[in-house]
């Protein structure tokens, strides 16, 4: 019998496993070949005990991990698939299967994860593996490190997957200022510090206001009180990562800036159509043409995940598991609130400029670190129930959440099974819309998670994102800005 050892949960893990939230990650991985279940079982039997989170269960009070025996067969599900069930298409079957999973809770008497093998051909893959686990086990960065540790390069099966380069946080002091005299440097430092303090105070005031009373505008994308208990549906689309990098270089911004600009443009277009449809219905079926159907002064905010590790690049799994590692395993991230601009712009580059300015400001604030610290203090002072209630209220009062995770740079394979795409998301949240971006092998996968009773057509949001990317690239080309970007 395995000795039971206990380890406390991190603050974010305690929040995520709370019955009032019970946030679960669900990762849809497409493969280019059919999946051999025996290969998956053998690999898990050899490796599951190397990772304590996947061989531990929660204590009864939800505060500690307890190591336990793992019967791998209980965690790997290979459902019988009736050919008649996929007569309308494999993609529809997989989508419905994953949607039903969001209504089935994980068994808390054993480690909080399972794997579902669906040997069904879809639009993008020959077979699909669905990995589901309680978000208390890990965040997106930790999961990708686990993927890298379990896979090999498709181009060279003898080599482990390409490690993603280590990324350091950018300095807030420009190189030109470092070369100036001490007086100008001191003036800049004082001004920058004052701005940092002011931004942090404003952000924390808005955070508390959001938890207590400040709500987003009720739009066709905002869910109601029961959205958390409704089933979720998932939709994903691949776009070119090279196109995103071209725009990034041409506009002198980051990939996150570009993705946020695309998100603002796409959601503005989608909402404009939804409002047009509602206006037309209200006029007894008389169709009218509107250029701008958006209400004035829409408050539309997104929670954005922020990695709190001092080393924000990826590290080998073994290094992440070491105590006091600068890039450690777990849920070491926090949230910031981004006020998205929902408006119709004649110049699509306006969305990019707005996102760049917004992200530059958020980087000059301690909101993320303070939010994590306050959650930690609140758990000690108020307890888990009160803390999760405040956290959930904060989520309910904003409209969506957005995240971006770097994936492997080259195509990878799991024991001879080449991976076609990686599409992560989550459920258990109080939003009708969730947006995840994941890069993999030269492509960016957009994953949209929706409550279908609120958003029946998530594919149209992806259409708008794809069209926004094309439009931005075309405008930059017309203005001659992409020619310089190609040289970078």
Curated annotation (Swiss-Prot):
- Cellular compartments per GO CC: endoplasmic reticulum membrane; plasma membrane
Localization terms from the record = Cell membrane; Endoplasmic reticulum membrane
SUPFAM superfamilies, A to Z: CoA-dependent acyltransferases (SSF52777)
Q: Which top EC class applies here? A: transferase
The residues annotated as the active site are: 135
Gene Ontology terms: biological process: triglyceride biosynthetic process
GO MF term set: diacylglycerol O-acyltransferase activity; long-chain-alcohol O-fatty-acyltransferase activity
The membrane topology noted for this protein in its Swiss-Prot or TrEMBL record is:
Single-pass membrane protein
Alphabetized, the UniProt keywords read:
Acyltransferase, Cell membrane, Endoplasmic reticulum, Glycoprotein, Membrane, Transferase, Transmembrane, Transmembrane helix
Give EC number(s), comma-separated.
2.3.1.20, 2.3.1.75
Q: Which residues are listed as membrane-spanning? A: 196-214
Chemical reaction(s) catalysed: an acyl-CoA + a 1,2-diacyl-sn-glycerol = a triacyl-sn-glycerol + CoA; a long chain fatty alcohol + a fatty acyl-CoA = a wax ester + CoA
Q: In which pathway does it act?
A: Glycerolipid metabolism; triacylglycerol biosynthesis; Lipid metabolism
Q: Which residues are sugar-modified?
A: 238, 252, 353, 397
Provide the tissue specificity. Mostly expressed in flowers and siliques and at low levels in stems.
| Record Pfam families | WS_DGAT_C, WS_DGAT_cat
Q: What does this protein do?
A: Bifunctional wax ester synthase/diacylglycerol acyltransferase. Involved in cuticular wax biosynthesis.
Q: What is this protein called?
A: Wax ester synthase/diacylglycerol acyltransferase 8
Task: Give the originating organism.
Answer: Arabidopsis thaliana
Q: What is the lineage of its organism?
A: Eukaryota, Viridiplantae, Streptophyta, Embryophyta, Tracheophyta
């Amino acid at each position: 019998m395995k000795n039971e050892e206990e380890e406390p949960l991190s603050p974010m893990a305690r929040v995520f496993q709370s019955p009032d939230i019970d946030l679960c990650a669900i990762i849809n991985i497409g493969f280019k070949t059919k999946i051999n279940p025996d290969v998956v079982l053998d690999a898990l039997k050899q490796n599951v005990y190397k990772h304590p989170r996947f061989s531990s269960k929660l204590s009864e009070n939800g505060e500690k991990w307890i190591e336990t025996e793992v019967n791998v067969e209980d965690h790997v599900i290979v459902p019988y698939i009736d050919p008649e069930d996929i007569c309308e298409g494999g993609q529809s079957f997989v989508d419905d299967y994953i949607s039903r999973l969001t209504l089935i809770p994980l068994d808390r008497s054993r480690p909080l994860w399972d794997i579902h093998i669906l040997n069904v051909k879809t639009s993008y893959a020959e077979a699909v593996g669905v990995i589901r686990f309680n978000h208390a086990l890990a965040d997106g960065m930790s999961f990708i490190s686990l993927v890298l540790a379990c896979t090999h390069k498709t181009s060279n099966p003898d080599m482990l997957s390409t490690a993603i380069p280590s990324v350091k946080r950018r300095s807030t002091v420009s190189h030109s200022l470092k070369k100036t005299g001490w007086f100008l440097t001191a003036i800049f430092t004082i001004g920058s510090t004052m701005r940092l303090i002011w931004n942090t105070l404003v952000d924390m005031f808005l955070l508390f206001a959001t938890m207590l009373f400040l709500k987003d505008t009720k739009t066709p994308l905002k869910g109601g009180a029961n959205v958390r208990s409704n089933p979720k549906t998932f939709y994903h689309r691949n776009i070119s990562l090279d196109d995103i990098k071209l725009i990034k270089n041409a506009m002198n911004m980051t990939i996150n800036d570009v993705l946020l600009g695309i998100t603002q443009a796409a959601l503005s277009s989608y909402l404009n159509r939804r409002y047009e449809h509602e206006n037309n219905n209200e006029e007894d079926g008389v169709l009218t043409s509107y250029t701008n159907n958006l209400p004035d002064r829409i408050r539309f905010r997104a929670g954005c995940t922020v990695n709190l590790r001092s080393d924000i690049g990826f590290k080998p799994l073994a290094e992440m598991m070491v105590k006091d590692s600068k890039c450690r395993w777990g849920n070491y991230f926090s949230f910031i609130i981004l006020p998205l601009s929902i408006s119709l712009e004649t110049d699509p580059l306006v969305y990019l400029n707005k996102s760049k300015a917004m992200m530059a400001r958020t980087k000059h604030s301690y909101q993320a670190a303070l939010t994590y610290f306050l959650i930690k203090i609140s758990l000690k002072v108020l307890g888990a129930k009160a803390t999760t209630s405040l956290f959930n209220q904060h989520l309910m009062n904003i409209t969506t959440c957005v995240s971006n995770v770097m994936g492997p740079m080259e195509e990878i394979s799991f024991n001879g099974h080449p991976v076609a795409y990686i599409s992560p998301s989550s459920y258990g949240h109080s939003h009708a819309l969730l947006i995840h971006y994941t890069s993999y092998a030269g492509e960016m996968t957009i994953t949209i998670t929706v409550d279908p009773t609120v958003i029946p057509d998530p594919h149209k949001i992806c259409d708008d994102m794809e069209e926004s990317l094309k439009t931005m690239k075309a405008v930059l080309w017309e203005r001659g800005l992409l020619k310089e970007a190609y040289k970078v």
